[in-house]
């Protein structure tokens, strides 16, 4: 009993000692720092603790120990002790899911990542063995190899093509001399706001009202003007001058403005960069003071301030430095009326003579002439400017501007039949018959100078009363469009009129329909005044039977086309004291209506009086005017004839049939070779003005000696403009396009310090 107790005690002690000996290092390795040396609860006197910290024995034992691995170690030690085996620590198999302990000398190779993880985890110069890399994409960059961009995964993007209306600079073949001072000049008819509204039904009805509003168009115009970045800008049809001046003031421009005389509220304006030029002289021409209608022109002298040593953002010096240049800038909007070549010539002649005088006053400063000239390239008026001389002998007065070759574009009936259907209905709600529409169209044309040649392609003829009243931008082009279905094309021109009991429009209502608005357009007032001046009262009351086809016919003579219509209507009128026949109608056109007649008609229109009797108009005619009409009843109209007064208007001398000027002028666009689809055979733009009833060229920039053309802004191709029925568009803010030229001062014109 005692022996067994002793053996048990010895075995227990040995076991405890062995267990303590074996578990001591395990205890030491496994115990966390706060519990090192503590005795844990458990069987026997040996303390036990638990830890999941990995440990690497410094003595070389690399046993991987977990929190409960010492149970197996004690069991194995007791088993080997019982069988007399020497002590050897057992190394349990390594758990492949466990991470190895940190060792700076340990080379750890993780398993190869999945195929989709190559680019994210793969390290430089470390490739797992026995792997196939053919299917794996290469890494984007290696430290030991040259970098190359990754291959494009998508198709190669093509270069963005330029829009069809993109405008590029076109350069002259001869560049200016090095060091020449250059400046950019612009000419632009920006379309007056009130004209756009007044002519919306005839010229711009395809354009939404909001896009035709001044706010919308102003933003487009200001953006475009800023884009071209001209140093000098000559603008026509400017009625919102204060708005435009404020916008351009923030962009460094100063400006002057001259409003037209008469009832119009638009005019011409000249802008210039304040840090490039300063204004040294200014004057304007009011042509009405010379008996040349209500158009105006501007003349100013600008002196350069920006030298090669001055930056554009610097304030210019108050006084000009030695070697500065001066330039005379002229801006004009010529009368529209295509048959009044005498007034057109008179206006241009007056401006050129005045510009030459101003140039002489300022030491022969070179001249730049900009504007809307309402004449076609190579017309007699164009040739007068370029060739310095024009002979009126044998030249028809209505052929001076070349507008007989203008292209008018009558609106298609389907575009507005529904829109204007209510305007063409009678009071009983029935649509007016064709003959009434024809009569209405003729009454719309009651102010037309019946001496106008039937082949004139003015916008007045096909586009009804609104254009008949005159849109001065409508003038010239190269082609002639057919005048078919003109009766339906002109329906919208009679929308505010009602037939009388006889089915015809009354004379009183017809006259009231010709009332000039309080804010009369420049086009409208110019053309109306032209037309009022060019016809007598009797002719105004006798041509309402003319048909649109006769107006548009390019092959019929004007007298024969109207003669069959005059007698019937004259009989209906029964005007006492007036003896009218065909020649009478055409005779009073030119000389019967003087300034007194214009004053009378202006008052009549302004008062808006409804005349109830057809004879009231005659009773109000001044005696002098009436007698002139009666005395001329036997004169037959000839479009080639010139009265002494008309010759004096054109040439300045009633005894002289030639008109001359002293300036050597060149059109800047004709000096620069351009694309075939943007230029005509003369080098001028194919189109500078485009709306519903016209497409052609009327705008120019001219330069005198002392200046050299460097480059011009290419016009918009005609095909690119024809995608829309007419301008303005959501992109372009006017029915004209801007002409821009860069000019250089010639060294011979360098001025000494004054």
UniProtKB/Swiss-Prot annotation:
Q: Write down any Gene Ontology CC term.
A: nucleus
What is its EC class?
A: hydrolase
Q: Which organism is it from?
A: Arabidopsis thaliana
Q: Which InterPro entries match?
A: CCR4/nocturin_mRNA_transcr, Endo/exonu/phosph_ase_sf, Endo/exonuclease/phosphatase
Protein name, entry field: Carbon catabolite repressor protein 4 homolog 6
EC no. given is: 3.1.13.4
Q: Where does Mg(2+) bind?
A: 237
Q: What reaction does this enzyme carry out catalytically?
A: Exonucleolytic cleavage of poly(A) to 5'-AMP
What family does the entry list?
A: Belongs to the CCR4/nocturin family.
What is the required cofactor set for this protein? Mg(2+)
């Amino acid at each position: 009993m005692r022996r067994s107790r002793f053996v048990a005690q010895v075995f227990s002690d040995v076991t405890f000692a062995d267990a303590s000996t074996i578990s001591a290092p395990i205890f030491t390795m496994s115990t966390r720092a706060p519990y090192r040396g503590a005795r844990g609860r458990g069987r026997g006197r040996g303390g036990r603790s638990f830890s999941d910290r990995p440990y690497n024995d410094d003595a070389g034992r690399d046993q991987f120990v977990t929190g409960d691995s010492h149970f197996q170690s004690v069991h194995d030690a007791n088993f080997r002790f019982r069988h007399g085996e020497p002590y050897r620590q057992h190394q349990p198999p390594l758990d492949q899911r466990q991470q190895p302990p940190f060792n700076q000398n340990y080379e750890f190779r993780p398993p190869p990542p999945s195929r989709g993880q190559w680019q994210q985890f793969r390290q430089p110069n470390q490739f797992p063995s026995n792997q196939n890399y053919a299917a794996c994409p290469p890494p984007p960059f290696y430290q030991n190899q040259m970098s190359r961009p990754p291959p494009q995964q998508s198709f190669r993007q093509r270069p963005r093509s330029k829009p069809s209306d993109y405008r590029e600079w076109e350069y002259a073949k001869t560049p200016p001399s090095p060091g020449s001072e250059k400046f950019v000049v612009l000419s632009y008819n920006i379309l007056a706001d009130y004209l756009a509204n007044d002519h919306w039904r005839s010229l711009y009805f395809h354009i939404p009202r909001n896009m035709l509003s001044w706010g919308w168009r102003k933003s487009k115009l200001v953006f475009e003007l800023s884009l071209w970045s001209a140093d000098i800008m000559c603008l026509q049809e400017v009625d919102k001058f204060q708005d435009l001046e404020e916008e351009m003031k923030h962009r460094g421009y100063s400006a002057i403005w001259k409003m037209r005389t008469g009832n119009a509220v638009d005019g011409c304006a000249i802008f210039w960069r304040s840090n490039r030029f300063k204004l040294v002289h200014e004057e304007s021409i009011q042509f009405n003071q010379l008996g040349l209608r209500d158009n105006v022109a501007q003349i100013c002298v600008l002196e350069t301030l920006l030298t090669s040593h001055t930056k554009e953002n610097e304030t210019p010096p108050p006084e000009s430095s030695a070697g500065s240049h001066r330039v005379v800038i002229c801006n004009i909007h010529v009368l529209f009326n295509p048959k009044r070549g005498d007034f057109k010539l008179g206006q241009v002649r007056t401006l050129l003579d005045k510009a030459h005088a101003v140039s002489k006053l300022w030491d022969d400063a070179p001249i730049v002439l900009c504007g809307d000239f309402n004449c076609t390239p190579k017309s007699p008026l164009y040739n007068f400017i370029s060739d310095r001389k024009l002979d009126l002998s044998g030249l028809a007065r209505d052929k001076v501007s070349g507008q007989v070759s203008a292209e008018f574009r009558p609106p298609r009936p389907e575009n507005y039949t529904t829109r204007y259907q209510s305007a063409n209905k009678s009071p009983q709600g029935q649509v007016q018959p064709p003959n009434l529409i024809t009569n209405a169209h003729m009454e719309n044309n009651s102010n037309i100078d019946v001496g106008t040649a039937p082949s004139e392609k003015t916008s007045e003829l096909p586009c009804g009363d609104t254009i008949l009243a005159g849109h001065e931008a409508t003038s010239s082009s190269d082609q002639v469009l057919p005048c078919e279905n003109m009766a339906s094309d002109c329906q919208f021109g009679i929308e505010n009129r009602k037939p009388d009991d006889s089915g015809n429009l009354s004379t009183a209502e017809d006259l009231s329909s010709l009332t000039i608005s309080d804010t009369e357009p420049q086009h409208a007032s110019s053309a109306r005044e032209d037309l009022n001046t060019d016809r007598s009262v009797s002719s105004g009351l006798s041509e309402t039977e003319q048909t649109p086809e006769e107006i548009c016919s390019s092959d019929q003579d004007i007298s024969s086309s109207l003669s069959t219509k005059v007698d019937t209507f004259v009989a209906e009128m029964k005007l006492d004291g007036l003896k009218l026949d065909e020649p009478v109608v055409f005779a009073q056109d030119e000389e019967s209506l003087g300034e007194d007649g214009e004053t009378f008609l202006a008052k009549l229109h302004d008062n808006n009086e409804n005349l109830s009797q057809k004879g009231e108009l005659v009773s109000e005619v001044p005696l002098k005017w009436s007698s002139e009409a009666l005395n001329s009843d036997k004169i037959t109209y000839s479009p080639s004839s010139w009265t002494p007064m008309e010759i004096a208007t054109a040439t300045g001398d009633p005894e002289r049939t030639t008109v001359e000027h002293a300036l050597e002028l060149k059109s800047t666009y004709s000096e620069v070779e351009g694309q075939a689809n943007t230029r005509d055979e003369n080098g001028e733009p194919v189109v500078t003005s485009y709306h519903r009833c016209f497409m052609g060229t009327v705008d120019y920039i001219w330069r005198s000696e002392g200046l050299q053309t460097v480059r011009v802004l290419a016009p918009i191709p005609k095909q690119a403009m024809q995608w829309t029925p007419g301008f303005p568009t959501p992109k372009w803010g006017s029915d004209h396009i801007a002409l821009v030229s860069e000019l250089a001062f010639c060294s011979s014109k360098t001025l000494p310090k004054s």
